[in-house]
Amino acid sequence: RCPFCHNAALVSHTDAQGGLDEEEFFAFLRKRRGILDGVCVSGGEPTLQPDIENFVAKIKGMGFKVKLDTNGSFPDVLRRLLESGNIDYVAMDLKNIPERYGMTVGIADFDVARVIESIGIIKESGVDYEFRTTVVSPLHRASDFEEIARLIPFAPRYYLQNFVDSGDLVSGGGLTELGEDELAKALENTRVIIPQAKIRGEE
C-alpha cells in the first residue's frame, strides 16, 4: 500500500459509506447514456478485483468509453483487459526508481519485474496510454527522474503529479509535495529522456 495513497478508506475498506453496489452503479450509468462519454475505472488497484474483466465489459457494452488506472502490479490481468478491446485508454503509475520501489509501495519484497512487464504490455497493446508519477518528499529526489524516465523512453505522455495531502492517507502523515524549484529540476531531468514530459496541471 503506497503510503501516499489518497484513498485510504477504499484501500483499507474501513468506510463503505457513500458507496454504490453494482446494480445501483449500472442503473446510474443507464440514466446517463448520451450525457456521459466514458468511465474511469480506478482504485485502489482495480486489477485486484476478481470480476474486473466482466465489470469493464459491462461498461463498454453500454456504449461508454473506458479508462483504466493501474499500478501495473498484475500484468496478466492487465494483458487480458487490454486484449479484450474494452479499454480505450490506460494510465499507469510509476512509483519510483527500481531500488526504492518496495519502500515506495509499502511492500519490502515487491517484485519490480511485474511493473516492467506491464510497461511492455502497455507499449505493445495498441491502446492509447500515459504514464505518471506522483512526486512525494521524502520518497523522491529530483535526481531520480532521469532514471525513472529510462524505463519508458518511448512514452508519448509522461506526467509528474506533485503530491497533495487529501487528508485521507494510508501513511497518516509525514509526506509533503516537492518544492517548486525541486519539481522543476525533476521535470528537467525527465526531459533528458522524454522531451515532451509535463507537470500535471501545467499542460
Predicted regions and their residues:
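Canonical Radical SAM [4Fe-4S] cluster-binding loop centered on the CxxxCxxC motif
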Residues: 1-20
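N-terminal pre-catalytic segment of deacetylase/amide-hydrolase enzymes
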Residues: 17-24, 30
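A C-terminal junction/extension of Radical SAM enzymes
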Residues: 184-203
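Short, charge-patterned binding micro-sites
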Residues: 44
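Hydrophobic alpha-helical segments typical of transmembrane helices
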Residues: 6, 24-25, 77, 186
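Conserved AdoMet/S-adenosylmethionine-binding subsite of the radical SAM
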Residues: 26-38, 47-182
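Residue-level detector of family-conserved "landmark" positions at structurally sensitive sites
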Residues: 15, 69, 132, 199-202
